Swiss-Prot record:
It is found in: Bud neck; Bud tip; Cytoplasmic vesicle, Secretory vesicle. Guanine nucleotide exchange factor for SEC4, catalyzing the dissociation of GDP from SEC4 and also potently promoting binding of GTP. Activation of SEC4 by SEC2 is needed for the directed transport of vesicles to sites of exocytosis. Required for filamentous growth. Phosphorylated at Ser-584 and Ser-598. Phosphorylation at Ser-584 by the CDC28-CCN1 and CDC28-HGC1 complexes is required to support hyphal growth. In stationary phase and growing yeast cells, is constitutively phosphorylated, probably on more than one residue, but the pattern of phosphorylation rapidly changes upon hyphal induction and precedes the appearance of hyphal germ tubes. InterPro entries: RAB3IL/RAB3IP/Sec2, Sec2_N. CDD domains: Rab11BD_RAB3IP_like (cd21044). This is Rab guanine nucleotide exchange factor SEC2. GO terms for biological process: filamentous growth; hyphal growth; protein transport. The modification Phosphoserine is found at residues 584, 598. Residues 327-346, 475-494, 667-693 have a biased composition (Low complexity). It holds the Pfam family Sec2p.
């Protein structure tokens, strides 16, 4: 048993020693595995570094030659820079020498100019002395003329006031009291005593029948709808559109004389606006002599430019219309209105209407029996800082008010009848200024320029054109009457034909553009209808008038009113397009040659306007068939209108023959540009040498064929046109003033 125990003990010891060895071996193995992992990581890191080094080595091999090349280039640029700096220093020296020489030349030129200016100053001083002497004479004459004008003005005003007070207005009752400030204060006794006589009709008949009659009388007299307005007539398609596109041009001078050259405005002016104000009052003696002499032009110019203000005598004058309906209302309502005014006036003294004792300046209304006859407002005319500069008109004039006004020229009392008329007139010109400012951003369009007829407004002051040449002076006054009459008759025929819609012109526009124009047209129709009704006379209270507010309607809504083109119009437009692409010359109705199609010449960019004008001339000739079409360009017609209008019918035939000759010369080299306009001296010399012999005509044609394209335009023609324009404006001003004086004298004699 002891041996067995020893044996077990030894086995146990041996097992313990083996287990310890096994544990130590396992620990060593774990440590070795960890070292192996670390070594593997180091190997992988070294491999990555090796790959990076290999790539960098490859890049270095590729970049090294480039670097060497860049170094060489840098050395070359340094050498070039040194050379450029040396050249720059040389050039700077040359520039300094040139500047010194230029300064010397400039100093010599300045000294010469100073000498010339000194000489001119001496001459101008002498001229100023002569002008001063003449101005003294002119001032003496102006003082005499001013005294005469004041005497005539006083006589005219006295005769007007007497005629209106005797014929149109009753005498003021003795019971009416005026204060020292020429004002009327309405109270309870005044309103009851003056309005009691109209209450007798309210007691007649039954109350129900009276209400029925009142309901019948409270209906609209005549009021068309917007959808009933026609937009297929020439008064909209041609006249109004041409007026709008002419008005929004930047170079258009916004004043009365230039507005009256547009047919649309001229027709409205003659038939609707000018007859609104039958009598234009004189300006006070504090204004200048020119303004007093041009009282009509000053008055209408102030309305057009917005330099007027219509203000009540007292603030309460604007509120009395809310309760007061005048004599046209029924007796009961009149009593109620009178009682309300009296109660309000007795309760608060600040709402009492105040009137002026003086009669109305424009119609002579002097009655004081009711509030609608009293002068509760006054019109103020302002003078701007730029009043004397009539040509500098811009969109800043569209702002109506007193911001740019300096002082009041005159103040006139107004009755309610003239108040409504003048308010509508001011609104009319405000709408025109609104169109002028182009608030709807309309695009510039020259398609309607050919339909804008500019008639002569002062024929009796038309100057006879005289052109001097080497042989002497030739006057065209003998032949001006026949040519002027023929031109005026042809223009009148064209205007009347288009006004009667015998010839329709349908110029296509964009849909948005057309809708904007329709809104503007309806806006003008609205204010024109208000002017018409104001001339007839009506009471402008809010509950008595139905008016549309166009500002609440967007312009896109008016696109539904655009008329659709008919089948005939579409076919006609197709014919016009096909004719515009026709490239061969053709003969017009009167035998004149018209050049159409493509024009090939070195001056092609400058002939776009002439091509458009020639195509339009062809279409107009085909549509009218009996009209006369000019073959000259539009620019030539504008520059030499006076010279061409003074020629006789035989000279016009000669000009057409010359154009045909020029056509035959240019046909071999395709169609060239249109015939240049000849100088007026050559035209008149040829007109003197022109006789009825056919041999001389052929000689003139041959000479013209040789020298037609060698003519050059002179800058003196532009100066001549400018002088003619200024002279025409002064003559037109004189004509308007004489017309106003004659009309005022005629009204005074009639009364």
């Amino acid at each position: 048993m002891s041996s067995q125990a020893d044996y077990d003990k030894r086995l146990a010891e041996e097992v313990g020693s083996l287990s310890t060895r096994l544990v130590t071996a396992v620990n060593k193995q774990v440590e070795l595995e960890e070292t192996i992992l670390e070594l593997r990581k180091q190997v992988s890191a070294l491999k990555l570094k090796n790959e990076q080094l290999n790539q960098s080595d490859i890049k270095l091999k590729t970049i090294l030659p480039k670097y060497i090349k860049l170094q060489d280039d840098y050395r070359e640029t340094l050498t070039k820079k040194k050379e450029a700096e040396s050249q720059n220093t040389k050039l700077q020296g040359e520039v300094e020498d040139l500047t010194a020489s230029l300064f010397d030349e400039a100093n010599t030129m300045v000294s010469n100019a100073s000498r010339e200016t000194h000489n001119f100053k001496i001459k101008n001083r002498k001229l100023y002395e002569e002008l001063d002497e003449k101005n003294i004479i002119i001032n003496d004459l102006q003082e005499q003329l001013q005294d005469l004008k004041q005497m005539f003005i006083k006589m005219e005003e006295q005769s007007k006031i007497q005629s209106y007070s005797q014929s149109n207005t009753p005498k003021i009752e003795s019971s009416t009291d005026f204060n020292e400030t020429n004002s009327i204060h309405t109270n309870t006794n005044f309103s009851e005593s003056k309005l009691s006589k109209y209450n007798t009709r309210s007691t007649l008949g039954d109350e129900e029948s009276q209400n029925y009659n009142l309901q019948q009388l409270q209906r609209i007299i005549y009021s068309p709808l917007i959808t009933s307005i026609r937009f297929d007539l020439n008064n909209y398609n041609i006249d109004f559109k041409g007026f709008v596109y002419q008005l929004i041009k930047p170079d258009f001078q916004f004043d009365l004389s230039h507005l009256k050259t547009i047919p649309f405005f001229k027709s409205i002016w003659q038939s609707e606006i000018e007859n609104c104000i039958h009598y234009i009052p004189s300006l006070p003696a504090t204004t200048t002599l020119l303004n007093r002499w041009q009282k009509g032009k000053t008055f209408w110019g102030s309305l057009i430019e917005g330099k007027v203000s219509i203000e009540p005598i007292k603030g309460s004058n604007e509120t009395f219309k809310l309760t007061y309906k005048g004599n046209n209302a029924s007796g009961n309502s009149s009593n109620e209105n009178t009682e309300s005014i009296s109660n309000r006036s007795s309760a608060t003294g600040s709402v009492v209407p105040v009137a002026i004792k003086d009669p109305c300046t424009f119609c002579g209304e002097a009655r004081n029996d009711s509030l609608e006859h009293c002068r509760l407002y006054h019109l103020k005319l302002f003078e701007s800082n730029t009043a004397n500069n009539s040509g500098n008109n811009s969109t800043n004039q569209d702002q109506q008010g007193n911001n740019d006004n300096t002082h009041v020229i005159a103040s006139y009392p107004l009755c309610n009848y003239c108040l409504i008329k003048l308010r509508n007139l001011c609104d009319f010109f405000a709408k025109i200024r609104l169109i002028r400012s182009n608030i709807f951003k309309l695009k510039q369009n020259d398609s309607f320029d050919e339909f804008i007829v500019v008639p002569g407004s002062f024929g009796q002051f038309k100057r006879s054109n005289t052109i001097s040449n080497r042989n002497g002076t030739y006057s065209s006054s003998s032949t001006s009457s026949s040519s002027t009459s023929s031109v005026s008759s042809s223009s009148a025929t064209t205007a009347n034909g288009e006004s009667l819609n015998s010839t329709t012109h349908n110029i296509q526009l964009e849909r948005t553009e057309e809708s904007k124009l329709i809104k503007l047209y309806i806006m003008m129709l609205l204010i024109r209808s208000k002017i018409f009704w104001s001339k007839l006379g009506f009471w402008d209270t809010i509950d008595q008038i139905n008016e549309i507010n166009l500002d609440e309607i967007h312009y896109e809504a008016f696109s539904y009113l655009i008329p659709k083109p008919t089948q005939q119009q579409q076919q006609q437009q197709g014919d016009i397009r096909s004719q515009s692409n026709f490239n061969s010359p053709r003969q017009s109705v009167d035998g004149r040659s018209v050049l159409s199609g493509s024009i090939s010449s070195p001056r092609q960019p400058n002939l776009d306007k002439q091509q458009k004008d020639s195509i339009v001339d062809e279409t107009v000739a085909q549509l009218q068939r009996d009209g006369v079409v000019r073959s000259e360009t539009a620019s030539a017609e504008e520059k030499f209108e006076d010279a061409i209008s003074d020629e006789t019918n035989g000279q016009e035939q000669l000009r057409s023959e010359k154009l045909q000759t020029g056509k035959t010369v240019t046909e071999p080299n395709s169609v060239s540009e249109s015939e240049p306009v000849q100088e007026p001296e050559q035209v008149r010399s040829k007109s003197n040498n022109n006789t009825n012999n056919k041999n001389k005509d052929t000689k003139i044609e041959d000479s013209d064929a040789e020298h037609t394209f060698s003519l050059k335009r002179s800058h003196s023609k532009q100066f001549k046109d400018q002088l003619n324009k200024e002279l025409d404006q002064t003559l037109e001003m004189l004509a308007e003033n004489i017309d106003f004086d004659e009309s005022s004298n005629g009204n005074g004699n009639g009364n």
